[in-house]
């Protein structure tokens, strides 16, 4: 005789639940007769789930039948959606049954936020001298997070870059993540007591960390280590990748040891540099090691190990080049000086606009007749997000030369280096007579003293 099905929910057995893989949910119907049965899925708001649904063939179990239906949800739907369950709708003959299948929950962990305060001698370069603030959010889950900066309570819209979120190496237990954001600041703003705020938004909560040269918001006294990836400028000019490990909040340099190694344990030659004291009475140090560009680009993982008598155990920080990084080469446009400048017989200004690139790390240099110009001749802005394409960046570099140099027919070349370019470099050259971009040999600016891989 006909028998209606008994319906059971099926949920993922994966523990801890990952926020990177598809989340599986299912519905089991058993002990029904005859064998004809169908399934459908609805969201909590009753709209139909029309993707990721898979229904398996009916199986005979003794004198009756069983069948299952499975649905795969993208992690974003689980992490950012408001649904607490899906509805499995079972249709068998004249019988319809609805079953609520709870959506698994990813373990939520709030981020730990810390900001590194630069030392007095950390500012360098032509006026205005600059340094960087580092904001690290660590030990958080799930992965979705936003980091932004404020200066004196007002949002900072440019001059900072945020690295891709990376998983932490915790072994067992819930998967956690970390992210580092870097803000470029000027020495004058820092000494004028500007208050900088790192704002971290995660799962509807906001976390703040304020810093200034007065240390109004006292930083943590715990020793902190920050692994800093190689810059493209260093790779482009020196043909080697420099790993940097920044150690902060040191009460003393005594017993400090910073060492780099590969994930397999192979030690790397590490040079340690010490800094002067910070306004809050602590010290900082950095440990640098050069590795082959090929090893870095391949995604090989490296470890910074810090030991100090104030640490209960060695502190290890892992770093590797993100593999999921979106790479887009830049478009380069050179704009000659305006006619109004020539009429006024002022100094000549040439602009190089670099657009639509990713990642944000980029190198811009100016040449005169193929020779590098001094950095005090030009100013390059920090990469900023494209207004209409926030996953891409743009920057511009402004070169100023004398009217005599421009009128003499000197050629000026804007050289742009970026890892997504076919040969990592492109250039545009302009002069008074042509005003049109031409090619120039840029090999003179590249160092031959880089590291060699064996």
UniProtKB/Swiss-Prot annotation:
Glycosylation site list: 45, 112, 192, 210, 238, 257, 280, 441
Protein name listed in UniProt: Ig mu chain C region
InterPro entries recorded: Ig-like_dom, Ig-like_dom_sf, Ig-like_fold, Ig/MHC_CS, Ig_C1-set, Immune_Resp_Modulators
CDD domains registered for this protein in UniProt: IgC1_CH1_IgM, IgC1_CH2_Mu, IgC1_CH3_IgAGD_CH4_IgAEM
Annotated spans, CH4: 325-454
Keywords (A to Z) from UniProt: Disulfide bond, Glycoprotein, Immunoglobulin domain
Region of interest called CH2, as start-end residue ranges on this chain: 106-218
Region ranges (CH3): 219-324
Chain intervals for the UniProt region annotation (CH1): 1-105
Disulfide-bond pairs as recorded: 27-88, 135-198, 245-304, 352-414
Domain of life, source organism: Eukaryota
PROSITE patterns for this protein: IG_LIKE, IG_MHC
The UniProt record lists the keyword Transit peptide: no
């Amino acid at each position: 005789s006909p028998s209606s099905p008994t319906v059971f929910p099926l949920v993922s057995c994966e523990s801890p639940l990952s926020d990177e893989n598809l989340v599986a949910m299912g519905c089991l119907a058993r002990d029904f007769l005859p064998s004809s049965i169908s399934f459908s899925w609805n969201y909590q708001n009753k709209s139909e789930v029309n993707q990721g649904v898979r229904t398996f063939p009916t199986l005979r179990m003794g004198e009756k039948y069983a069948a299952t239906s499975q649905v795969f949800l993208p992690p974003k739907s689980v992490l950012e959606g408001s649904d607490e369950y899906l509805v499995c709708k079972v249709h068998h003959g004249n019988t319809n049954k609805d079953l609520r299948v709870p959506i698994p929950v990813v373990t939520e962990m709030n981020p730990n936020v810390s900001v590194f305060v630069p030392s007095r001698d950390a500012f360098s370069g032509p006026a205005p001298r600059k340094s960087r603030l580092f904001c690290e959010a660590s030990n958080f889950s799930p992965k979705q997070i936003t980091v932004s900066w404020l200066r004196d309570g007002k949002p900072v819209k440019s001059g900072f870059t945020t690295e891709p979120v990376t998983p932490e190496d915790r072994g067992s237990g819930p998967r956690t993540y970390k992210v580092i954001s870097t803000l470029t600041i000027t020495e004058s703003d820092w000494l004028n007591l500007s208050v900088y705020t790192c704002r971290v938004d995660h799962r509807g909560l906001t976390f703040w960390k304020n810093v200034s040269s007065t240390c109004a918001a006292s930083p943590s006294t715990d020793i902190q280590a920050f692994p800093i990836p190689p810059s493209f400028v260093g790779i482009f000019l020196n043909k080697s990748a420099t790993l940097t490990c920044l150690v902060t909040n040191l009460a003393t340099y005594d017993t400090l040891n910073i060492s780099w190694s590969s994930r397999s344990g192979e030690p790397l030659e590490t040079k340690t540099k010490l800094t002067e004291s910070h306004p809050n009475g602590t010290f900082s140090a950095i440990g640098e090691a050069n590795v082959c560009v090929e090893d870095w680009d391949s995604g090989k993982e490296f470890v910074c190990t810090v030991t100090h008598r104030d640490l209960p155990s060695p502190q290890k920080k892992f770093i590797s080049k993100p593999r999921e990084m979106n790479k887009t080469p830049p478009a380069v446009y050179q704009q000659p000086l305006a006619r109004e400048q020539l009429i006024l017989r002022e100094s000549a200004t040439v602009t190089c606009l670099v657009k639509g690139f990713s990642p944000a790390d980029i190198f811009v240099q100016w040449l005169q007749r193929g020779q590098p110009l001094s950095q005090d001749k030009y100013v390059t802005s920090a990469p900023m997000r494209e207004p209409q394409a926030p996953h891409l960046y743009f920057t511009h570099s402004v070169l100023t030369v004398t009217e005599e140099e421009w009128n003499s027919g000197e050629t000026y070349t804007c050289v742009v280096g970026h890892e997504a370019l076919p040969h990592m470099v492109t250039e545009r050259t302009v002069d008074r007579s042509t005003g049109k971009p031409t090619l120039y040999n840029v090999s003179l600016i590249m160092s031959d003293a880089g590291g060699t891989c064996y």
